[in-house]
Amino acid sequence: MATLLYRIGRFAFRKAWYVVAAWVLVLGALLGTGLALGGQTQESFTIPGTESQQTIDKLENLFPSAAGAAATVVIVAPDGQSVNDDTVKQEISDVADDLGNLDQVAAVVSPYSEYATNAISEDGTTALLKVQFDGPATDVTDATLTQVTTAGDTLDADGMTVAYGGEVFSNQTFGLTITEGIGVLFAGIVLFITFGSLLAAGLPLLSALIGVGVSFAGITLVAAFTSVSSTAPMLAIMIGLAVGIDYALFILSRHRSQLARGMDAEESAAQSVATAGAAVVFAGLTVIIALLGLLVVGIPFLSVMGVAAAFAVFAAVTIAITLLPAIMGISKGKLAPKPGSRAARRAIAAASHDDEKTDAATPASPASVTSPSAGAAEIESGAPAKPAESANPAESAKPTKPTKPSLGGRWVRLVMKAPIVFIVAVVGLLGVASIPAFSLDLNLPTAASQPEGDSSRIAYDTIADKFGPGYNGTIVVVADITQTTDIQNDLAGIRSDLEAVDGVATVGPGLPDETLDTAIFQVVPTTAPDAPETKALVERLRDMKGEVEAQYGTPFTVSGQTAVAIDVSNQLSNALIPFGILVIGLSILLLAMVFRSIAVPIKAALGFALSVGASFGVTVAVFQNGLFADLLGVHSTGPIISFLPILLMAILFGLAMDYEVFLVSGMREEYVKTKDARRAVRVGFQHGARVVTAAALIMFFVFFAFVPEGEGAIKAIALALAVGVFVDAFLVRMTLVPAIMTLLGKHAWYLPKWLGRILPNVDVEGESLREHIEEREWARRHDGAVTAEDLAVEGSGAPVSFDIPAGSVAVITGETAARRLIGAAVAGRIAPDAGHLQVLGHCLPSESGPVAKRVTLVDLESRRPDATTTVGDALNERLRLGLPWFRRVPQGDTEELIGRINGALAGIEGETPIDIHRTLGELTPLTQSLLAVALGVADRSDVLVVDAGDGDFAHPSTPAFAGAVASIADRSTTVIIGLESEPASHASTVGDRALVRIALPGADPGDADLSSSSPTASKGGPR
């Protein structure tokens, strides 16, 4: 992965303006389309298959008007007047008539209608006007809602107070607010303190804002076609903004650190994306996987939220590894810390420390690579060294004063002195913070969670005050009356039984449908929809189903807002533990792959559980119990939104793994180099502490900004995430982790051998990139077409070295299996197991893709020609592969290849010329082989590798084979031929082309002295 990211970073740097233009086009297209279609969110929480949802679905068929969306117009008479006054009554009735004439309105029930039930408050000051739409809330247009409010607002002019409630008025068109600005402001302050540069501080903000724009536009577009919760876009923006800034911070820190140490800007950008970017991709993928894991829960609205947030994270990751290096390419070396600055001194000191660790006698090259944790090097501790890209050489030579030990260094030393004390303190503190979580009460959001002053909140509060809290959440009982013979009396009896249930305020009369199959009862509880007593009432109503059915023969189901909330909460509660096991299990597996350890992932998972518990506890204490509610701008307390626990686990999991990787990867790198466990903890912590601190503070401020200024359910989610990030970063990762790692010592890095063989090796630390850069530097020192040094492929025998100049002919002799393996490695088809190998300037195996495109491999032993195919057809088919589908193969190309074959056959005893009409079955084995070579030549590759296998034509009795192959290939093509043994006369058959002889260990070198005929001939090859 690191090598792929290295190439992406280098490409983005070189093609900076193209990459920037591409992102501008993507953002513009999404924004333009999304805003043109005008997506709208809604508070719709349903779970297919639950009793409440099945009841709603049934009502849609039997009572279409009752199943449609509803709105309540709450009208309060002017002071000193009553809604029963003739003037007020007439005005309200006129508005009801106007509403009834609107499109999409199925029915309007005036508070004075005979069908109205308890629509006027006891004190006569408030009336409820019911508006029933002909479809679900998603179908009600903005134009219709505007017409409803316009008609109702005419009462305001007459001194009445009007508010609008119901699901349709909980829908929200969303947009960016001051909340995001507050988070960005705090993030900018942290970034400026971290980098000490406005330009550097602005880049993470810019990339994050572009990511937020892309995700915002995408969700707006999707909301125009499907139901999207109003929480989803704000959650996506909040997550996208936080991770977007953090991911850019990690990569940019690495880049500035390398620039300060003198690395070329392009190389630095590529390596930053490859190392820190690899950790970013890993962290982003864990968040995305966890969020997409919400799909398995089977709750549509939660799935949409998970996908929306995952898309925001995907956008943040993609921008960090593409757009950010492009901006680095535009900025060139301007992002380097100023020579002599604190950032420069720290970065240089970290480089000096790394050199001291590895080999004091070997100077660090500009292409040296460190782990992603060193991305924070510029903001760690250090000593003076040469600054990067200094315009004034004398300035570079100025002595710089050493920096004091960093706060992170002092902190980790303190923790390591008394690890048990810190472990007990952290676990005890987080355990106490988790206690309120045991009283966690889950429910769906109601209008009570809307901001004060919002119309739906005013309507909700007015109804609760004037009619009773239960009127905001009517329970619907749907009875099947197909088996009753006395409908009227049975419905009256059921109503009486329902009224007798504890917690019921009133019950409306049973209303049968037109076919007398089903009847509905409106049950008004005495308590609010989200009250525990109302939940208990729903359960009591459901418990009496058997009794009612036995007495009246009428089975019934229970639905309504509270019933839906109970079903949703139950479904979420049932999914919470399996999902938690899945998330924690995933974390253990992923970290075991990354760190090659058992203890590290188990410790990380336990720390994650502590963070989640503390986050739950604090959220319950504030939003449910009211602790510090006023201080935090929480204006109403009550149950926690049902999907918060599972959503928090998904998001916090990824963020926790993010910090774990950046801290512990440095520890692992140090331990691998020194085998000193205590030193590894100290040095690794110092490498990553400052950047993790900055990242955690940014996330905390971004999330926390949504608490006092956010809307609805997002406030609780924001607080939970803010607390979770703070606890996980500062108490768990930066205190508990070094304490536990100190106690475990070298046992922290133990991994059973059998498990190590099973687990894939995730190269987050960039080890493959180090190897790639070393191989690339080695390849640049050799100008031959193919060069190998101590090359070994499993099954090929002892290592071999050789150097094949461009345009020469090389003959490899040895066992067939060994030759074929070496040939396949040269062609980029298989990876070498050891040694160095370069082909046409590309190092293998990391650049096997370009090599495979420029090298043709012809394995004669594996050929299976169709005896009935003609020579012309075989050549035309191969030549056609290299042409566009609409072009024909020029006849001259086919004739040219046949001419080359005949030229090679000329003078070979027993061989005759061929033409396009000869079938392959009519050809001799040697001619068939030369035709196969010609098919390979048709690819016009720079290197042609031919292995003769065990064919008779490869016997020394056919000495002209090498010359025949060489004459078919272009003179500029480097030809490598594999034979069992090489006759002496091969040297003369290749003409004036250089001949290189390579004898694999154990091969018969032949009886020729090739030194006089081949100026580059070698055995083993030059080094």
Which residues does each PLM region occupy?
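Conserved beta-strand
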Residues: 784, 788-807, 825, 835
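Conserved ABC transporter NBD signature motif
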Residues: 832-843, 851
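Q-loop/switch helix immediately C-terminal to the Walker
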Residues: 861, 867-904, 916
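Hydrophobic anchor residue at the start of the ABC signature
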Residues: 929, 933
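Structured non-transmembrane domains adjacent to transmembrane bundles in polytopic membrane proteins
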Residues: 49-70, 79-166, 439-629
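Glycine-rich P-loop/Walker A and Walker A-like loops and their local beta1-loop-alpha1 context
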Residues: 796, 806-831
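Conserved catalytic loops of ABC-family nucleotide-binding domains
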Residues: 286, 940, 951-988
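Membrane-embedded transmembrane helical bundles of large multi-pass transporters/channels
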Residues: 1-39, 105, 136-440, 553, ...
